[in-house]
Regions:
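Structured soluble/peripheral alpha/beta segments that form catalytic or ligand/cofactor-binding pockets
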Residues: 1-366
Length: 366
């Protein structure tokens, strides 16, 4: 079972590239983007994943403008054997230049949503800390992820209007991840497992001449499982980004977080992240949300279009909803990203704060 990538010297096992190194049913490979205006007037998200052992390739595109509805396109198909085939019906992703430029196209379809967008990077690729989570003696997540910060150029149309996306304004975050992650239909059979929980917070932020990045996985009692903070140079154009700039990434000793929530919700009203240097210096970043995006619009915790679930040989769907009118404590609505204004007391910037938590003891709500 060969595909086009087998012509490159990239193999990590004796098998062709189509064969995963693990037989875990939840092995996956994912491409994800966001894009947003610094003033919080709009936000859009993009996702595509292949789940080889589930036989699924799925995608989503979702856009929201301030004080308007969020519009969502979903697509799913039988996973192709050819890994360079990154298309689901009217949706496709084209890697124009690896680690630099990616095109995303959603052609005319029944949702009334379409786009033609080009991402171009403004940072080197940034590899995050390894993300390994356990349930007893079993790894339920084991993933590598890298990020890039950049810009978008192109157009978006949705049922409530059109957006002209200009790279002089529109900021972008890209992440690529692969490994094992629990998705799709839940497993059945076997002995019941003990309840646990997770708290996740991610803050990719733009400043004038650099980016800052922090990621947190905490356990049900607030114990740190994964924590990382870093900074890296931000370039004015894609052409200025060096091919080999990994040494320019400055990893901090660690990071910490504090989140204040709107009463009776799991939606952040404000937050702070501390980047703690190797010299014990502390850079405190204060974040103020200005726009909310519901991650179920990309399939996360969606009751019908959850990632990795079998929908059929080729299916597409769509929906629109007002994020302000949703039940904030419904399971499908507690995963969100918020565009945030940020300040460290000397500099100001903008970025995104993502969070989700399912925990037995809600220690940070007390």
């Amino acid at each position: 079972m060969l595909n086009k990538l087998d012509d490159y010297p990239i193999h990590q096992t004796p098998e062709p590239i189509a064969y995963s190194a693990t037989s875990d049913r939840n092995v996956y490979d994912r491409t994800w983007f966001n894009g947003y205006s610094p003033d919080g007037s709009y936000y859009f998200g993009i996702g595509m994943s292949i789940y080889p052992h589930r036989g699924v390739l799925d995608c989503a595109f979702s856009v929201v403008e301030k004080d308007k509805r969020q519009h969502c396109f979903y697509g799913s198909r039988r996973a192709p054997l050819e890994r360079t085939d990154m298309s689901v019906g009217p949706f496709r992703i084209e890697v124009v230049e690896p680690m630099r430029k990616t095109r995303v196209v959603l052609e005319d379809n029944s949702s009334g949503i379409k786009c033609d967008l080009m991402f171009s990077t403004r940072t080197v690729p940034i590899q995050e800390a390894r993300q390994t989570l356990w349930s007893g003696t079993r790894r339920i997540m084991d993933a590598t992820r890298f990020d890039q910060f950049g810009r978008w150029q192109g157009t978006i149309s949705h049922p409530d209007g059109d957006l002209l996306i200009d790279d002089s304004e529109c900021l972008a975050t890209k992440d690529r991840s692969w490994g094992v992650r629990a998705v799709g239909e839940p497993e059945t059979g076997g002995a019941p497992t003990a309840g646990g929980g997770i708290f996740f917070l991610w803050t990719p932020l733009f400043w004038d001449d650099h980016i800052s990045h922090a990621i947190f996985f905490d356990g049900p009692n607030g114990e740190p499982l994964v924590r990382e903070g870093l900074t890296a140079p931000l370039y004015r154009t894609e052409a200025e980004v060096p091919d080999n700039g990994q040494s320019l990434i400055e990893k901090q000793l660690t990071a910490s977080h504090r989140v204040e929530y709107h009463p009776g919700t799991r939606l952040a009203a404000s937050a702070e992240v501390d980047l703690i240097g190797h010299d014990d210096s502390i850079r405190t970043i204060k974040m103020t949300p200005i726009l909310k995006f519901m991650m179920k619009g990309l399939g996360y915790t969606h009751p019908d279009w959850r990632q990795g679930a079998w929908q059929g040989e080729l299916e597409i769907g769509h929906e629109s909803f007002d994020p302000r009118q949703l039940d904030p404590l419904a399971a499908e609505n507690i995963h969100n990203q918020q565009v945030v204004k940020v300040s460290d007391g000397q500099r100001e910037g903008v970025g995104v704060m993502e969070q989700i938590f399912f925990v037995a003891r809600q220690y940070y709500l007390l």
